[in-house]
């Protein structure tokens, strides 16, 4: 998944009912049942602090949603024949199902999208120039390996 969209999605998952910060953003309370947070923040974290921790603080950041995807997939230690993308889920899943000779009704059912994420909606509202650059640097291998553009999606 595109690192920008992935980080926004994770932040929204960890912080219920969160609107975009629109440049400044207020601090919000993380749901402690979902996350063991950095002790210095008393469970109150702005999106800017969240990105800073995601991109720099390895000691406290243990959530797999934030790890680089190349590390989670153990690339290049494991050589994958095919890696699908969430952005192309319907197409990629159909490809895999056809390769597995799945029945046509399974392929047709898999093509029905009923849980589209909104994490890509206006990512520019979430990222300042500085935050976007931190993400580009920290997740550079993800951008390269999975051929994601370094620019924020529109």
Residue ranges and their predicted role:
Residues 1-126:
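PAPS-dependent sulfotransferase catalytic domain
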Residues 105-153:
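PAPS-dependent sulfotransferase catalytic core
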